[in-house]
């Protein structure tokens, strides 16, 4: 086994020979990261990515300046989907070490699950992985129900069934109930709804290769809310929360749904399909109907929903939408506390009417006359939230996955958003 490379932190600038803007230097003892107080966590994460790029796969975080957040920043940059890495962690107090261990267990689960090939992770596998993770941290405080295939159609989950019926792998709805009170009549505090499209070809509105090659990650919203619930439980969540994952493949076959099809939902809404690649909102609608029926204080849905959100924010921020200004402010405050990037985008009443159809109440995609695609997608979802003006947050997960490495991240999933949602649930 190779000897670990020591990584230490310093608030002193690097020797001038390393350059005026050097953020790290090397000596006989190892590598020194030079913190300047401006963005220390970002500096540590970027340095970790560089250290990994040097081929250094065994490190020891050394010295007294490391805390849980700094250790975590290092790991976020150091972790990558290929190869193995070993970190010898510094001595931390019990609370910080427990926090770090929980992040490593749960957020790494989120990243690894999103990175899994679609051949390995179908709708049923995603639902079962979610059950296993939550059960691991919640024990007997959790119950769940899995509904799949024709049972979905018979029970009226027409959006999820319609999207998923084109695949040989049956669509699946996971309904999970975390109830720490033990009282079956206890009110539900929050519902989390996740888009779990385990591969998205676009259907008959087929994607080009350049847009399809990362679509194993189209279940990023489901993984994120699952991780958020698990992480909130490790932080002492003592309120009842229900999780709904809407899992399916969106593929082409003789049984796949087609443009012009009309879906009738359990709340009476009829939706004309004019783009089979706008499938995420069709499956989320079923989950949001179930969530609304619980009468919770809070509904949060998360989905890799639109390219428009990525166009606006890149992969650097998650997009946040809500009619509830106070609740949006609470989410953004949680994001600030957890050092995770969220940005609120517009959502107004008029966005709800920008999905006209000649044959149904709603179209599943906006026309060229209404180009605000991320906002109209959120407007579409609002039609399936009973009290959409209060207590509902929609997260378009544009920061979930990176197709190529950048200075802070390897290629693949980031795990961003888990801590923010967990923070809000436990605030």
UniProtKB/Swiss-Prot annotation:
Q: Which reaction does it catalyse?
A: Release of an N-terminal amino acid, Xaa, from a peptide or arylamide. Xaa is preferably Glu or Asp but may be other amino acids, including Leu, Met, His, Cys and Gln
UniProt lists the gene as pepB
Q: What organism does the record attribute this protein to?
A: Shigella dysenteriae serotype 1 (strain Sd197)
* Cofactor field: Mn(2+)
The organism's taxonomic lineage, starting at the top: Bacteria, Pseudomonadati, Pseudomonadota, Gammaproteobacteria, Enterobacterales
Gene3D superfamilies assigned to the protein according to its UniProt record, in alphabetical order: Zn peptidases (3.40.630.10)
How this chain assembles, per its entry, is: Homohexamer.
This protein is called Peptidase B
Keyword Lipid metabolism assigned to the entry: answer is no
Looking up NCBIfam families in the UniProt record yields:
PRK05015.1
């Amino acid at each position: 086994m190779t000897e670990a490379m020591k990584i230490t932190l310093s608030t002193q600038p690097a020797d001038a020979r390393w350059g005026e803007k050097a953020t790290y230097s090397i000596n006989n003892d190892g590598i020194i990261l030079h913190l300047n107080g401006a963005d220390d966590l970002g500096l540590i994460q970027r340095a970790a990515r560089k250290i990994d790029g040097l081929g250094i796969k065994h490190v020891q975080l050394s010295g007294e300046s490391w805390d849980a957040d700094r250790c975590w920043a290092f790991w976020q940059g150091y972790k990558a989907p290929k190869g193995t890495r070993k970190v010898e962690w510094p001595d931390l107090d019990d609370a910080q070490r427990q926090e770090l261990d929980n992040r490593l267990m749960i957020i790494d689960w989120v990243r690894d699950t999103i990175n899994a090939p679609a051949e390995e992770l179908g709708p049923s596998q995603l639902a079962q992985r979610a059950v296993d993770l939550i059960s691991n941290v919640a024990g007997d405080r959790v119950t769940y129900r899995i509904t799949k295939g024709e049972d979905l159609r018979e029970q009226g989950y027409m959006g999820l069934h319609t999207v998923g019926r084109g695949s040989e792998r049956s669509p699946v709805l996971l309904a999970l109930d975390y109830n720490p009170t033990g009282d079956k009549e206890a009110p539900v505090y929050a519902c989390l709804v996740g888009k779990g499209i385990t591969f998205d070809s676009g259907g008959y509105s087929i994607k080009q290769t350049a847009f399809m090659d990362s679509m194993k990650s189209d279940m990023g919203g489901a993984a994120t809310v699952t991780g958020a619930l698990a992480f909130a439980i490790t932080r002492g969540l003592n309120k009842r929360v229900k999780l709904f994952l809407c899992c399916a493949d969106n593929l082409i076959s003789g049984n796949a749904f087609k443009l012009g099809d009309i879906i009738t939902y359990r709340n009476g809404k009829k939706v004309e399909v004019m783009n089979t690649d706008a499938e995420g909102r069709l499956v989320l609608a079923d989950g949001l109907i179930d969530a609304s029926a619980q009468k919770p204080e809070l509904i949060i849905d998360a989905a890799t929903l639109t390219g428009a959100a990525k166009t606006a924010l890149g992969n650097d921020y998650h997009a946040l939408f809500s009619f509830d200004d106070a609740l949006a402010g609470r989410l953004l405050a949680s994001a600030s506390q957890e050092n995770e990037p969220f940005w609120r985008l517009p959502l107004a009443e008029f966005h709800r009417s920008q999905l006209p159809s000649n044959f149904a109440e709603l179209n599943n995609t906006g026309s060229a006359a209404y180009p605000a695609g991320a906002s109209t997608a959120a407007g579409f979802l609002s039609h399936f939230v009973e009290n959409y003006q209060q207590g509902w947050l929609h997260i378009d997960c544009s920061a979930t996955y990176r197709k190529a490495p950048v200075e802070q991240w390897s290629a693949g999933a980031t795990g961003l958003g888990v801590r923010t949602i967990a923070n809000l649930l436990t605030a």
